[in-house]
């Protein structure tokens, strides 16, 4: 069983036990830091567990070594995965915007294929070691300073748009048809 916890990582542990004292805290292990979201175990190779943290951090956790590797796609559609830090910074730079809980999936057709979204969709066929941007900006690219709140436009210093809110105009979910490889819903 795996799950995310606010401010306290993503963790995995046993779904049950034959021990008379039940499952203990020591039975659980951390697979990713930060704010934990949805860890997804590789459905074929149980060695790997993928997990996300705030603002798009994506990690591949290796159960054999007990170590995680940051695999967040880099900004700008380049191929090498971001290797420094799990979160990789707000939005990833390069004009990219990322949701607080950025979506990702493991393809139901190929367990080494991952999809991850910010305002673009990225694909990896090698468990996140490299990425390719596979879409244009899929959002309306709304500027929060141009959206009325409570019936008016607010000055830049009235609301901390970049300090305490998630980016607007981001992908919030990704799914792939279980019947047709490559048919994606974003």
Model-derived features: positions:
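Beta-propeller blade termini and top-face loops
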Residues: 1-186
């Amino acid at each position: 069983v795996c799950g995310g916890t606010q401010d306290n990582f993503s963790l995995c542990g046993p779904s049950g036990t034959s021990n008379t004292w039940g499952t203990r805290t020591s039975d659980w292990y951390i697979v990713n830091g930060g704010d934990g979201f949805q860890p997804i175990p590789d459905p074929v190779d149980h060695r790997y567990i993928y997990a996300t943290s705030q603002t798009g951090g994506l990690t591949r956790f290796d159960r054999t070594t007990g170590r995680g590797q940051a695999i967040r796609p880099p900004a700008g559609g380049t191929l090498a995965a971001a290797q420094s830090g799990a979160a990789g910074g707000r939005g990833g730079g390069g004009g990219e915007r990322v949701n607080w809980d950025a979506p990702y999936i493991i393809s139901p057709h190929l367990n080494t294929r991952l999809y991850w979204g910010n305002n673009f969709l990225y694909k990896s066929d090698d468990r996140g070691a490299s990425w390719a941007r596979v879409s244009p900006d899929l959002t309306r690219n709304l500027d929060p300073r141009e959206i009325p709140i409570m019936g008016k436009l607010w000055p830049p210093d009235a609301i901390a748009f970049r300090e305490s809110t998630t980016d607007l105009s981001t992908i919030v979910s990704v799914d792939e048809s279980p019947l047709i490889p490559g048919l994606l819903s974003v």
